[in-house]
């Protein structure tokens, strides 16, 4: 089953996490690149001109702001992070940013998906489509995922990882995520006391 972009948010006995996967049929020549406080989705070497074909293929997919990790499938990662940095709650930052930026104005009306998790275990996940906006709380000790296609409502999922590398690997092709086609690249942030970032 093809779900497009996928993200997961939650916590387990080892810590809190956000994870992101690019699945793509149109622009498969992308990679994730880690920086000290963020992970970006960028074209692979030799495909830099793809950004002129679509404004939606290069963006920060994860950003760390204070004690919160933000994850999304587009430029709204930065908007959400900036709202949280200004003092807004996670729930309100997700809701306002998704509502303001709306779904992507491409041929597919691609939804914007987003999530965030704080070191205290508070986590939210959300989506905006052409006909709905959802922001749900993820209970402590649980994980939920959402995707741009097919699975456009938050779904509880067993997510097995003890660090950021394992979280990135898990959303790429482990557990339930192994059933979803066209994986391209993935990334994750994981924290027990401090956020660490990994990308594949």
Predicted regions and their residues:
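Conserved short alpha-helical segments that host acidic/polar catalytic motifs at enzyme active sites
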Residues: 1-200
């Amino acid at each position: 089953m093809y779900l497009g972009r996928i993200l997961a948010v939650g916590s387990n006995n080892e810590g809190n996490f956000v994870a992101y996967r690019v699945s793509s049929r149109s622009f498969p020549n992308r990679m994730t690149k880690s920086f000290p406080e963020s992970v970006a989705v960028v074209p692979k070497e030799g495909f830099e001109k793809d950004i002129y074909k679509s404004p939606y293929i290069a963006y920060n997919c994860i950003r760390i702001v204070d004690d919160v990790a933000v994850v999304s499938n587009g430029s709204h990662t930065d908007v959400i992070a900036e709202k949280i940095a200004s003092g807004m709650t996670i729930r309100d930052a997700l809701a306002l940013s998704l509502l303001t930026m709306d779904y992507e104005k491409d041929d597919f009306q691609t939804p914007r998906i987003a999530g965030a998790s704080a070191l205290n275990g508070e986590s939210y996940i959300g989506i905006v489509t052409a006909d709905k906006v959802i922001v749900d709380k993820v209970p402590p000790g649980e994980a939920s995922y959402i995707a741009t296609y097919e699975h456009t409502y938050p779904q509880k999922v067993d997510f097995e990882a003890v660090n950021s590398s394992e979280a990135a690997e898990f959303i790429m092709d482990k557990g339930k995520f192994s059933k979803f086609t066209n994986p391209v690249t993935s990334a994750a942030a994981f924290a027990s006391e401090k956020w660490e970032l990994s990308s594949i």
